[in-house]
Amino acid sequence: MGPRQRNRHLRAKTHIAPIIIGSFFGFMLLASVAFGVGMIGVVDTWLQDLPDYTDTDLYLSSEPTTILDAEGNEIASFYTQNRTTVALDQISDYVIDGTVATEDERFYEHGGFDLVGIMRAAWVQLTGGSEGASTITQQLVRNTILSDEQFDVTLQRKVREIYLAVKMEEIYSKEEILNMYLNAIYYGHGAYGIEAASNVYFSKSASDLTLAEAALLVGLPNAPSQYDPTINPDYALQRRNTVLDRMLRNGYISQEEHDAAQAEPIQLNLSETSGTGVDVYAYPYFVDYVRDLLSNEFDYNQISVSYTHLTL
């Protein structure tokens, strides 16, 4: 091949290379656009038939029907979930601060979905630690209006959860979301919400919890059975101290408060609540009679969920 032919051959190769590269990137761009359009269609399908996230009653499902004697003393209660709803100002600041520090330390900064939190959680897990990536708002959605899907480990469920969490943050304040969360989440031993949990484990109101008591309860929703202080006190103590560590790290408590609370042993004062759906404190036969009378007029769920006081 002569010099002139070689030059023509090289020029041809030089001209073909940009065409090949351009075609490749053009194909990738078209494929990306097609994939994006397809995903939009898929996600749109996933977001069909969403529950009504504007109804606050859906986040605070059932409360008990209570039977009182003529003096106003409680003698029995019927419930499907042991829950007593309280306002945020009736909950100890230790519970509020501990929940944010432990479950979602960027709660006041994100809009329901926290990409920074996801990246941090991924790094912690890669380095051998353990940290969740779901925000408090996502957890509220998962445990209430999407409770039927909470064990569905799919991308579809996660997309629905994130979408609802973002929409909730658009219509509710951070305080309202936190209040709904603390009244809805499960703390073990049949206790739903922080007020019921405070009564079950310590026989006191959530407003009266000490720092050590609050930290113990804050640690329970992550794994109520594993951290159950009546069964696994060592695990419960470790979890409580982890909550205290995070409260210190986020500036909610001082070093002195942290050290004093960690030095306290776990001291429970369990209530008489049975967790079975019927708590009878006096006159058991009469309570059975009243329940039978109610059953003639209403079904079990109406009796157990209505949050009614019956004075006899």
Predicted stretch roles:
Residues 68-69, 169:
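Core beta-strand residues in small-molecule sensory/regulatory alpha/beta domains
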Residues 3, 24-37, 85-124:
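Conserved catalytic or metal-liganding residues and their short signature motifs at active sites
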Residues 69-76:
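Juxtamembrane extramembrane loops of integral membrane proteins
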Residues 77-78, 256:
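Short capping micro-motif at the N-terminus of alpha-helices
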Residues 60-63, 70, 81-83, 91-96, ...:
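Extracytoplasmic
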Residues 128, 132-310:
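Non-catalytic, structured segments within soluble enzyme domains
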Residues 1-67, 106:
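N-terminal type II signal-anchor transmembrane helix
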Residues 9, 13, 17, 21, ...:
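Structural motif marking the loop-to-transmembrane transition
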